[in-house]
Design a protein with these regions (language model features):
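C-terminal non-catalytic accessory extensions
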Residues: 200-236
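Active-site-adjacent beta->alpha loops and helix N-cap segments on the catalytic face
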Residues: 3
Length: 236
């Protein structure tokens, strides 16, 4: 109700502004999408986390992918013209080669709805936070020792706090390194556009302007297909 009231006031007052937000498109209705567009919505950021419903359920994310896709369609139908940043947490608990392929497919599905030139996947790994269910799970599974120090500056300990275990970590790393090739980036950079003109740091610049996250996902898809992942679904 508060969200609708704010948007309605912006529309009623005819305020000429552009706003952005971190949202859950799974909660967007056709009416809300209309209000968002009429009130001046710009770019949006969405935590999709994974393209696998199984992984999302295991992480207790509390939404269904079908509803997220519907929200994107409602935005498109309402006339949304901004960019959509999709946050993925690769190699989450429960991820497999098959679910990674599902994440690639989810990006493609959203890009087909809104347009590839307006959908920007950003790739993250889950950070371990003390006194959380995630931390307790990792202790029970033996990934973390029961007496570990979350404030330790030991490089091995710090690395473990960013959850990206093998064997999927190696597959993801190869896809990232190919996408982050410095020479290819320099050749593709738009003429006259610098990092400092557009974004606070180089990572955001390359993530949005160069769409490096998309390149990582496409590389990952190619590697997974080469390993035979998902091929059975594509056979007639």
């Amino acid at each position: 109700p508060q969200c609708n009231e704010i948007l309605d006031r912006i529309i009623a007052e005819k305020l000429d502004l552009t706003w952005s937000g971190y949202i859950r498109t799974s909660l967007i209705t056709p009416d809300l999408a209309r209000r968002m567009v009429q009130s001046g919505v710009g770019d949006l950021e969405v935590a999709i986390t994974s393209g696998s419903q199984v992984v999302l359920n295991e992480l207790h994310m509390g939404f269904r992918l079908d509803n997220l896709y519907d929200g994107c369609r409602y935005l498109k139908e309402a006339g949304f013209t901004g960019n959509l940043i999709l946050n993925y947490s690769l190699n989450s608990p429960g991820d497999t080669e098959t679910t990674l392929m599902e994440s690639v497919a989810s990006y493609k599905k959203i890009a087909a709805i809104l347009g590839e030139d307006r959908v920007f996947p950003m790739l993250f790994f889950l950070g371990v936070q003390p006194h959380t269910g995630f931390e307790q799970r990792l202790i029970q599974e033996g990934y973390l020792s029961g007496g570990y120090n979350p404030l330790s500056l030991n490089p091995v300990a710090v690395k473990k706090m960013l959850y990206n275990p093998p064997p999927l970590s190696h597959l993801i790393a190869r896809a990232c390194l190919r996408a982050w090739d410095k020479t290819a980036w320099e050749q593709a950079s738009p003429a006259g556009r610098s990092v400092h003109e557009l974004y606070a740091d180089e990572s955001l610049f390359r993530g949005v302007v160069e769409n490096a996250g998309r390149d990582v996902l496409i590389n990952l898809e190619q590697d997974l297909l080469a390993r035979g992942v998902g091929q059975s679904r594509n056979r007639p």
